Structures are given as structure tokens and as C-alpha cells.
């Protein structure tokens, strides 16, 4: 168990009390909004710290009662019986406080851009990309999130060669951020007469949606080209130059949007470009912060195989945490909480281990 930073906990309690006092003094609306936001951020950890303090005091009182020679036998027996239970509660609360004191990912509360692309496997890969999209769409619906289509390229036999959407709601990125990587499927395609199992894959990228304040894009760093959007067979769907390609010159990142509205295409392309640049900065900072994380919840590398969906065996395996669940049908219907929660827990354990290694 890593020792809890008592000074830090005392500072949080003091700050929380100060916020409560300031909010009670009828500040102006702008100040009140800022105070309310900080109050909300601190509420959970302060509540747990207070619970822990109360439990420790209770344990101290019980220990004193047990060790006091003047305590009558019945009360001493009661103290001996109750103390182990209180100590167990203290251990749980200490773990809770440790997790709440972990460094916060600034992107956790952001919306996300979800990109799914068919990989190896031809037609079957596109079908699987479609299955993954429906899985995330159902998970989002269960969470009360909103999914909006940005662009899609359908597969020749169904599914998607590529689909990009935004996902908006509370805690979206914190839940979806570990989905980035290569997802592999093993199943018998409907067109396979011999019943042979085929393996194909799709790549998922989850990017935190960035605001202007998160990432600066200078006008001189981008090149915007317009062209005619093409429909099936390469025919122009209209006579105006509506498709937009934006190139970020310093990084070479290119985004193309080809819907009917040039204005909407430009806005969407900038939205995706901003998210990709912000994600690039986050990945760089994370890599510099700790190489040790690479052995925990994967490297975050988009080319890393993270999960296998085996249909004949009805199982899904997350290779980063060696977790196998035999409920593939439910997972494909959007029942992802067990996988998502296990990944978050593993990430928190790794962060706690890092804190324990610090001098």
C-alpha cells in the first residue's frame, strides 16, 4: 500500500471548506460558476477523505477501548469484534482515495471522434467494421450519448471501408479511449461454402475532440484545396467545388471531407484535424512522461492488436490485460462495461505503481 499524502489531503479539505464559504457569500455569477465547477471536481475526493478520517477515528476509539484495562469485558469483546471490520473498511477507503488523487487526464471529460477502418480481410473486414460501429453505437445509446455521422465509405458487400463519427456526452473519452488499436475477428463468412474460419481486422481510433483553446492551428500552417465531390462510378454529384482537403503542412496530416456542403466540409475537416493534432500532442507527452506505461494497457499504438472476437467459440479476448469473456453476443450488442471497466482499473493500477516507484 502506497502511503497517502496527508498534506495533500489536508490541503484539499481546506480548499473545499474555503469554496463552501465563498459560495455562501453570494459572489457574482462568473465567480460562482468557477467556484461551483471546482466544488464539483473536489466533492468526490473530499467525501472519501472525510469518510476515511471518520473510520480511522472509529478504529482508534475501538483500539483504545480494547486496550483499556478499565473497560468491562462485554465492551472489550465488542471492540475486539468490530475493529477488524473497521480496518477492512479503512483499507477500501484508502484505495478509493488513492485512485481519486491520481493525476487526471485532461481529455477524459471531452467528447470523442470515433474512426473505424476496415483492415486486412477484404469484404469481411468491411462487414466487421460495420459490426464494430453498431457495437459502439449501441453502447453509446445505453450510456445516453449522442452519435453523429461525419463521413462514411460503405463496403462493396455491406459494412464500411471507413466510418467517422462524433460521440458526445458525459465521460465519453474516459470510457472509449482504450478502444484504439487493431480489432481482429475470427468467424466463418456467410459466403464461405466450406465452413472455414477466416481472420480479418479493423482499426479503431478514438480521438478527444479538441477546442480552439486546446490546440492552436495557424492559418499559415494549413493548405486548403477544394475539388468536385464524386459519387458512384466517379461521376460528379454536383457542379460546384464542394469537397475540401485540408493539409497541415508541419505534420503532413491531411483530412478530406466530400459531402455536398463546402462550408460544412471545411468545418468538419478542421474539427478532425484539430482532434488529430491534439491527440498527437497527448501521445507525445504520454510517451515522454513514462515509458513504463508501454507494458501496461498497451502502448496506445494504433497498429497494436488489442482484441480478438472469436465467433465460433463465442468469446472476446483483450490481449492487453489477458481478459477473456464468453459473452461475445452481448458484447457485440454493446455490453462493453466489463471490458471498459477492467481496462480503466488496470490503467489506475499502473498509475498507482508509478507513484509507488517515485522517490
Swiss-Prot record:
Gene3D superfamilies: 3.30.160.20, 3.30.70.1660, 6.10.140.1950
Cell compartments where the protein resides: Cytoplasm
InterPro entries recorded: PCRF, Pep_chain_release_fac_I, Pep_chain_release_fac_I_sf, Prokaryotic/Mito_RF, RF-1
PTM text: Methylated by PrmC. Methylation increases the termination efficiency of RF1.
A GO cellular component annotation in the UniProt record: cytoplasm
Keywords: Cytoplasm, Methylation, Protein biosynthesis
Main location: cytoplasm
UniProt function note: Peptide chain release factor 1 directs the termination of translation in response to the peptide chain termination codons UAG and UAA.
The protein, known as: Peptide chain release factor 1
Organism per entry: Brucella suis (strain ATCC 23445 / NCTC 10510)
Amino acid at each position: 500500500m502506497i502511503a497517502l499524502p496527508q498534506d495533500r489531503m489536508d490541503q484539499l479539505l481546506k480548499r473545499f471548506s474555503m469554496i463552501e464559504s465563498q459560495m455562501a457569500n453570494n459572489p457574482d455569477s462568473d465567480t460562482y460558476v468557477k467556484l461551483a465547477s471546482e466544488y464539483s471536481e473536489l466533492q468526490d475526493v473530499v467525501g472519501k477523505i472525510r469518510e476515511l478520517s471518520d473510520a480511522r477515528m472509529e478504529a482508534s476509539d475501538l483500539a483504545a477501548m480494547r486496550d483499556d484495562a478499565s473497560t468491562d469485558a462485554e465492551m472489550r469483546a465488542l471492540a475486539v469484534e468490530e475493529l477488524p471490520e473497521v480496518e477492512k473498511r479503512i483499507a477500501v477507503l484508502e484505495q478509493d482515495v488513492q485512485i481519486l488523487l491520481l493525476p487526471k487526464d485532461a481529455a477524459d471529460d471531452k467528447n470523442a471522434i470515433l474512426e473505424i477502418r476496415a483492415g486486412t480481410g477484404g469484404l469481411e473486414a468491411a462487414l466487421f467494421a460495420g459490426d464494430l460501429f453498431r457495437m459502439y453505437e449501441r453502447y453509446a445509446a445505453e450510456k445516453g450519448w449522442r452519435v453523429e455521422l461525419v463521413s462514411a465509405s460503405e463496403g462493396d458487400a455491406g459494412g464500411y471501408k471507413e466510418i467517422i463519427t462524433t460521440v458526445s456526452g458525459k465521460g465519453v473519452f474516459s470510457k472509449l479511449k482504450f478502444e484504439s488499436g487493431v480489432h481482429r475477428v475470427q468467424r466463418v463468412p456467410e459466403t464461405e461454402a466450406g465452413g472455414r474460419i477466416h481472420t480479418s481486422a479493423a482499426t479503431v481510433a478514438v480521438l478527444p475532440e479538441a477546442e480552439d483553446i486546446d490546440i492552436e492551428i495557424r492559418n499559415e500552417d494549413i493548405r486548403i484545396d477544394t475539388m468536385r465531390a464524386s459519387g458512384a462510378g466517379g461521376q460528379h454529384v454536383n457542379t460546384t467545388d464542394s469537397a475540401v482537403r485540408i493539409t497541415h503542412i508541419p505534420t503532413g496530416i491531411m483530412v478530406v471531407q466530400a459531402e455536398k456542403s463546402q462550408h460544412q466540409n471545411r468545418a468538419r475537416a478542421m474539427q478532425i484535424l484539430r482532434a488529430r493534432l491534439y491527440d498527437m500532442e497527448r501521445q507525445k507527452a504520454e510517451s515522454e512522461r513514462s515509458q513504463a506505461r508501454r507494458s501496461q494497457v498497451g502502448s496506445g499504438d494504433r497498429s497494436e492488436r488489442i482484441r480478438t472476437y472469436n465467433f465460433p467459440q463465442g468469446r472476446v479476448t483483450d490481449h492487453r490485460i489477458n481478459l477473456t469473456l464468453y459473452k461475445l453476443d452481448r458484447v457485440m450488442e454493446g455490453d462493453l462495461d466489463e471490458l471498459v471497466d477492467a481496462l480503466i482499473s488496470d490503467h489506475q493500477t499502473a498509475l498507482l505503481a508509478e507513484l509507488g516507484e517515485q522517490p
